[in-house]
Curated annotation (Swiss-Prot):
Record lineage: Bacteria, Pseudomonadati, Pseudomonadota, Gammaproteobacteria, Enterobacterales
Primary enzyme class: oxidoreductase
Classification via SUPFAM superfamilies: Thiol:disulfide interchange protein DsbD, N-terminal domain (DsbD-alpha), Thioredoxin-like
GO cellular component: plasma membrane
Name the UniProt record assigns to this protein: Thiol:disulfide interchange protein DsbD
PANTHER family attached to this UniProt entry: THIOL:DISULFIDE INTERCHANGE PROTEIN DSBD (PTHR32234:SF0)
Annotated keywords: Cell inner membrane, Cell membrane, Cytochrome c-type biogenesis, Disulfide bond, Electron transport, Membrane, NAD, Oxidoreductase, Redox-active center, Signal, Transmembrane, Transmembrane helix, Transport
Organism (species): Salmonella typhi
Catalytic activity entry: [protein]-dithiol + NAD(+) = [protein]-disulfide + NADH + H(+); [protein]-dithiol + NADP(+) = [protein]-disulfide + NADPH + H(+)
Main location: membrane
Length: 567
């Protein structure tokens, strides 16, 4: 019996030792993408369900999920709302955990039809997988009678992105409308318009006067709302074209010209003949009657003064970018309501509530020119990138606050000195990105990052290993979509301790952001599951599996790891 027990213990120990052979330090703690995100699908005629089972401790990015049909037509795909995840480099992103089901309506599918599904995810421990692509074969489905054709490519993760990224909400239109009311082309006209609305009657009850003014404003709002709906509908039809770089540049130029008109460089307004005709039509209406006042307001909405043309055009272009019908109509309605509020006050309370006319009205008009200039910066930022976008915002901020400071110097009141100090401080803060760009930022004084040699194929890797001349080699895999890769660059590779240990090491880096065929081949050849992954080769060009790094390491941990791998 004792011999049997001894034999059993020896067997258990040998089993543990055998398992330990496969638990080497270089073994990745992360599972392959197919096990982290188990994908499946099920089709029942027109109804297709895509599903992912997400492993605990992993997540999928909502914006990285895309569906592309081939020889098939599908309805617009709506992804369910995810949970918010935030990191230092990419900010807030919607993600999915545990399980994701996406219903897809197949309007029509021919023989051999497929869906190409692309998705990408990461692990909470700081390990990201390259984009995964799956091909789903579709059963033949006859087109339904009420099926509506959809574009060939549906990028579901970005469905609402253009509208969501617009620079201001519709409520800003209300404030813009109120501001436009105090420009030199509009404010002096309110007493005259008030008299026309009341029909020349001076003794009307407050309620009656308020009602007539409100009806006039609603007539004006009707015209603007209709314009907003038409432009939003047109923008919806050409939404994809409106995101093309050439179109964005063209819109930015138009916005810049509109802003210059607010600065007084030239005048924008309807042809005088058309304005005269509309004015005559308005004069034929009977003031003091609800119907006549409503028509007056509707016609007034079509008569654009030099002060209102540029802001109105800017808002219309903003709406076209959104392609949102509700946003389009609501924005223009609030804009008209903002312009009409001072008129309602004048109609009820008289001229005593209006501020006195003066040069300040021209300053209001100029200020709106700077507001319009923010729109081309917003559009160009999509093309030129975040760094140059920040510099444009900086330039705009310096220009606006500098102009406001110089303008405020004309004031004589003591409290304006506080305003001047605030404006000057804002201008100095705004100039910082331009200063960093021109003279170098303080971060430039930080220790230099590692100097990598780029490789992209297996052949280039073998050639670099052959040219290492007996030196050890480190190969770092990097991608723009890998958060932990950026953390390695910022916190680990910049550390003097790490740089000192790697002083005699040949440094290679493979950028696999594109995830193209040669990237996939390199990853597969080296059995790399995801990023960040760092490989080490000895002086003979052989990989040291036990030294392989998967996942983020801070400078101290990575430095210790480098010391441990050294012979």
């Amino acid at each position: 019996m004792a011999q049997r027990i001894f034999t059993l213990i020896l067997l258990l120990c040998s089993t543990s030792a055998f398992a330990g052979l496969f638990d080497a330090p270089g073994r990745s703690q992360f599972v392959p993408a197919d096990r982290a995100f188990v994908f499946d699908f099920q089709q029942n005629q027109h109804d297709l369900t895509l599903s992912w089972q997400v492993k605990e401790g992993y997540y999928l990015y909502r914006k990285q999920i895309s569906i592309t049909p081939t020889k098939a037509d599908i309805a617009a795909v709506q992804l369910p709302a995810g949970v918010w995840h935030e990191d230092e480099f990419y900010g807030k992103s919607e993600i999915y955990r545990k399980r994701l089901n996406v219903p897809v309506t197949v309007n029509q599918a021919a023989a051999g039809a497929t869906l190409t599904i692309t998705y990408q995810g990461c692990a909470d421990a700081g390990f990201c997988y390259p984009p995964e692509t799956k091909t789903v074969p579709l059963s033949e489905v006859a087109a339904a009678i009420d099926a509506t054709p959809t574009p060939a490519v549906t990028q579901t993760g970005e469905t609402s992105k253009p509208a969501a990224q617009l620079p201001f909400s519709a409520l800003w239109a209300l404030l813009i409308g109120i501001g436009i009311a105090f420009t030199p082309c509009v404010l002096p006209m309110y007493p005259l318009i008030s008299g026309i609305v009341l029909g020349g009657r001076q003794r009307l009850s407050t309620g009656r006067a308020l009602l007539l003014a409100f009806i006039y404003v609603q007539g004006m709002a009707l015209t603007y709302t209709a314009l907003g709906l038409v432009v939003a509908a047109a923008g919806l039809q050409f939404q994809a074209a409106l995101q093309h770089p050439y179109v964005l540049i063209g819109l930015a130029i138009v916005f810049t010209l509109l802003a210059l008109s607010m600065f007084g460089l030239f005048t924008l307004q309807l042809p005088s003949s058309l304005q005269t005709r509309l004015t005559l039509m308005s004069n034929r209406q009977q003031g003091g009657s609800p119907g006549g006042v409503f028509v007056m307001g509707a016609i007034a909405g079509l008569i654009c003064s030099p002060c209102t043309t540029a802001p109105l055009s800017a808002i219309l272009l903003y709406i076209a970018q959104s392609g949102n019908m509700w946003l389009g109509g609501g924005t223009l309605y609030l804009y008209a309501l903002g312009m009409g509020l001072p008129l309602m006050l004048v109609t009820v309370f008289g001229n005593r509530l209006l501020p006195k006319s003066g040069p300040w009205m021209a300053h209001v008009k100029t200020a709106f020119g700077f507001v319009i200039l923010a729109l081309p910066v917003f559009l160009l930022e999509r093309i030129i990138g975040e760094a140059w976008g920040l510099r444009l915002w900086s330039l705009l901020g310096v220009a606006f606050f500098g102009w406001a400071f110089i303008t405020s110097l004309q004031a004589r009141r003591a409290w304006m000195r506080i305003v001047q100090i605030i404006l000057l401080a804002a201008a100095l803060i705004s100039v910082r990105p331009l200063q960093d760009w021109a003279f170098g930022s303080p971060s430039a004084q930080a220790p230099a990052h590692l100097n990598f040699t780029a490789i992209s194929t297996v052949d280039e890797l073998n050639q670099a290993l052959a040219q290492a001349k007996g030196k050890p080699v480190m190969l770092d895999f990097y991608a723009d979509w890998c958060v932990a890769c950026k953390e390695f660059e910022k916190y680990t590779f910049s550390d003097p301790r790490v740089q000192q240990v790697l002083g005699d090491t040949v440094l290679l880096q493979a950028n696999v952001t594109a995830n193209n065929a040669q990237d996939v081949a390199l990853l597969k050849h080296l059995q790399v599951l995801g990023l960040p992954t760092i490989l080490f080769f000895d002086a003979q060009g052989q990989e040291q599996p036990q030294a392989r790094v998967t996942g983020f390491m801070d400078a101290a941990t990575f430095s210790a790891h480098l010391h441990d791998r050294q012979p």
